[in-house]
Amino acid sequence: MNFKKGEVILAPMASYTHSAFRRLCRRLGADRTYTELISAVGVLRNGIPMKLAYFTEEERPIHIQVFGSNPEEIAQASVVIAKELKPDFIDINFGCSVPKVLRNKAAGYMLQCPPLMGEVVKETVEALKPYGIPVSAKIRLGFEKDEVERIVEELQKAGVSLIAIHARTAKQGFSGKALWHRIKEAKKVASVPIIGSGDVKSWRDIERMFEETECDGVMVGRAALSNPWIFKEFKEKRDIEVGLKERMDFILEELSMMTEYMSREKACAEIKSQIVQILKGVPNSRELKTYIVHAENCKELVKRIEEAKERELLYA
């Protein structure tokens, strides 16, 4: 299995962690990446959604993340993906707590029934054996009740190779504090590598999570959207001041890469949410964000980004 203890990993985040962003984070020091959520039913009905599943060799090791409510469908969709794309892992998402997903009794909803989670993993592991692709899982502490040890044991018994634990319940979403000590307790019953996740906001938090939980890897989520340099900071053990010009260069490079798997107009529309994120914490950025994201077309958007680079001193 392709995993090294001590890895720092970019978490999957819907609408953000597509191929371009993943590549840039790998260049900045992320050790591993995951795709956004891909519906098993969608794959079986309509084929693989390439905007979500597209990746380059630079992004490896990569986990293609699948969700659903039916073990057989998840296993079948995983085989379709394995045959066509040959990822390093198929990841089964049991952690997403978005209401729409929960209403479909998928992902985080399944935390209510650990034996069913085990069945999903077991069927998928068996289905993927001919392709030599292992199965990982992304979980939370539980649905409403914290029963993470039981969940870990069920998944191990079913043949999972790697587990990422977000240290909140599905009901909590992102509210309250992530209970890092529960990752440590889950690690005690684990025979597979455990990746810790939740409330990792700086490179020092990455260091602290390794120390406090004894986890094998740390997953960085929302903090990487505003500071993708967090991976480089951890590797170099220092804070890195990133100016407006460098932030806007990041956006322009991401935008250029996005056109490999979507139209330029679509890329320009989608990059706006990342612009808002990457300007977080930049002094006097409120009016700059508004100015850039209200560009009416691609040409105007790029022009405004270039203007922002030239005006860096005004925002320093």
Swiss-Prot record:
Organism, scientific name: Aquifex aeolicus (strain VF5)
Catalytic residues identified in the record: C96 (proton donor)
Chain's role: Catalyzes the synthesis of 5,6-dihydrouridine (D), a modified base found in the D-loop of most tRNAs, via the reduction of the C5-C6 double bond in target uridines.
Catalyzed reaction equations: a 5,6-dihydrouridine in tRNA + NAD(+) = a uridine in tRNA + NADH + H(+); a 5,6-dihydrouridine in tRNA + NADP(+) = a uridine in tRNA + NADPH + H(+)
Needed co-factor(s): FMN
InterPro entries: Aldolase_TIM, DUS-like_FMN-bd, DUS_fam, tRNA-dHydroUridine_Synthase_C, tRNA_hU_synthase_CS
Superkingdom to which the source organism belongs: Bacteria
Family, as annotated: Belongs to the Dus family.
UniProt-recorded Gene Ontology molecular function terms: flavin adenine dinucleotide binding; tRNA binding; tRNA dihydrouridine synthase activity
Keywords: Flavoprotein, FMN, NADP, Oxidoreductase, RNA-binding, tRNA processing, tRNA-binding
Primary gene name: dus
Top-level EC class as recorded in UniProt: oxidoreductase
Protein name: Probable tRNA-dihydrouridine synthase
Amino acids binding FMN: P12, M13, A14, Q65, K138, S197, G198, D199, G221, R222
Pfam families in the record: Dus
EC annotation from Swiss-Prot or TrEMBL: 1.3.1.-
